[in-house]
Design a protein with these regions (language model features):
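A short, aromatic-enriched beta-strand patch in the conserved N-lobe beta-sheet
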Residues: 58-59
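A conserved loop-to-beta-strand element in the N-lobe of protein kinase catalytic cores
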Residues: 54, 63-71, 79-80
């Protein structure tokens, strides 16, 4: 999962509760890459107070790897629930419920100064037979209101401001909040796929 790690399923032997464990490799990373990992963990931790953000439970640091223990969502991501399982097809009430949860999570993140920058169905996890959606993967998140980062995120869900051509990039900045708002509209379109 992601550029720096893989995700495993683990079960707490004392409580029998399943968790997802994201293993972030530290070996061979440049300082800049390690800084990105630390930022991802920090911002996810701050945002996980919201019920529609995947809870970050614990961080365990080893010499070669950082293990991030997060809430386990066995139903997978929104993308597979839409495209493979057809869970939302023709169910306007379920679509509305799910989309409002995503909006609420993103608005909460914005209210505490976090901008996700990679909103897409693959980064929204689903529980409760599709009734609950939770924002995940803060690998590209930032606290910068305006950023000069263009082209970060996933191409199919990228706002026009983030996908500008090279000569446009030199002349203007990209408002992080507005990019997330445009992408929310694209997420809504995915429900009708």
């Amino acid at each position: 999962m992601g550029a720096y790690g893989v995700v495993y399923t683990a079960v707490d032997i004392h409580t029998n509760i399943p968790y997802a464990v994201k293993a972030l490799n530290k070996i061979g990373l440049e300082p800049r890459q390690r800084k990105f990992q630390q930022r991802e963990i920090q911002l996810h931790h701050q945002a996980s107070a919201h019920p529609n953000v995947v809870s970050l439970v614990k961080i365990m640091d080893a010499p070669d790897c950082t293990y991030v223990v997060i809430e386990y969502c066995p139903e997978g991501d929104l993308f597979s629930n839409i495209t493979e399982q057809g869970k939302y097809v023709g169910n306007d009430d379920l679509i509305k419920r799910a989309f409002l949860q995503i909006l609420d999570a993103v608005e909460y993140c914005h209210s505490i100064g976090i901008y996700h920058r990679d909103l897409k169905p693959e980064n929204v996890l689903v529980t409760d037979q599709g009734m609950t959606c939770k924002l995940a993967d803060f690998g590209l998140a930032t606290t910068d209101h305006v950023t000069s980062d263009f082209g970060c995120g996933s191409t199919f869900y990228m706002s026009p401001g983030r996908s500008r051509c090279q000569h446009c990039r030199e002349s203007s900045a990209n408002p992080s909040r507005m990019s997330n708002i445009v992408t929310q509209g694209l997420l809504l379109l995915c429900f009708s796929a």
